[in-house]
Curated annotation (Swiss-Prot):
Localization: Cell inner membrane
General function of this protein: Efflux system for nickel and cobalt.
UniProt name for this protein: Nickel/cobalt efflux system RcnA
Originating organism: Salmonella paratyphi A (strain ATCC 9150 / SARB42)
Gene that this polypeptide is encoded by: rcnA
Chain positions covered by the region annotation Disordered: 122-143
Lineage: Bacteria, Pseudomonadati, Pseudomonadota, Gammaproteobacteria, Enterobacterales
Length: 274
């Protein structure tokens, strides 16, 4: 592939940039340790909007550093593969890995939602059985429904954070350190960016992709932190689709990653057949 201006003239470059932006936004919405711990931390320390922005930017910085290291390392290693006969096979192998990642993400999200629905149904059944004598309605807050979907390991981290920091005075340095450590968790989206950058063989376009991913991820994480500072529960009450959107975001991410894999697989297969 050529440089970024050439790709734009050929009409190919547009596919990668919007995909990276959308992937960063969707990844930021996916259930994950950093987002949950950030929200729990801000709520526990009764943080301000400024502190929420600091926390979100710190988490984004460390998370982005991991993506940059992976992407730059991939582009550096790709210099060893210059033969035209090898490149189509690399594209095909990368496509298989990307499609496998997309299928794993989709299956994991579906399984988690099914477990949540089964547990919620069991809770409702027990609740009706134990309180069938009570003629007064018992309403569960929207926040409880949203929290019920979170991974058990994720909830344990959030609860531990709230116990440790509840009511304590926290310095800006501690907030930055917490954000930096919270963003070091790798993600399937970073693997996708790595494989795409290997195939692009163009630093400008690869760097633009990673930058687009990073900026959209930063916007999402900062929004999550600010939302926690002004109360996530209030946001959920004002918009009933908030928890549904967060719950379904991994589906869109897996579909987007799958489309990227199909695109690369077609190009690799075409190159091999030629």
């Amino acid at each position: 592939m050529g440089e970024f201006p050439t790709l734009l003239q050929q009409g190919n470059g547009w596919f990668f940039i919007p995909s990276a932006i959308l992937l960063g936004i969707l990844h930021g919405l996916e259930p994950g340790h950093s987002k949950t711990m950030m929200a729990a931390f801000i709520i526990a320390i009764k943080g301000t909007v400024k502190q929420a922005v600091m926390l979100g930017l710190a988490a984004t910085l460390s998370h982005t550093a991991i993506v940059w290291l992976i992407a730059l390392g991939g582009m550096y290693l790709s210099r060893a593969f210059t033969a035209q006969s090898v490149e189509p096979w690399l594209q095909l192998i990368s496509a298989i890995i990307i499609l496998s990642t997309a299928c794993w993400m989709f299956w994991r999200t579906w399984r988690g939602e099914q477990q949540w629905l089964a547990g919620n149904h069991h809770h409702d059944h027990d609740h009706d059985h134990d309180h069938d004598h009570d003629h007064h309605g018992h309403i569960h807050p929207e926040g409880a429904t949203s929290k019920a979907y979170q991974d058990a390991h994720e909830r344990a981290h959030a609860a531990d954070i709230q116990r440790r920091f509840d009511g304590q005075t926290v310095t800006n340095g501690q907030i930055l350190l917490f954000g930096l450590t919270g963003g070091l968790i790798p993600c399937p989206a970073a693997i996708t960016v790595l494989l795409i950058c290997i195939q692009l063989k163009a630093f400008t376009l690869g760097a633009t992709m990673v930058l687009s991913f990073s900026l959209s991820l930063a916007l999402t994480l900062v929004t999550v932190g600010v939302g926690a500072a002004i109360s996530v529960q209030q946001a959920a009450k004002r918009w009933s689709g908030f928890s549904t959107l967060a719950r379904r975001a991994p589906y869109f991410s897996s579909i987007l990653i799958g489309l990227v894999g199909v695109y690369m697989g077609i190009h690799g297969y075409t190159g091999i057949m030629q």
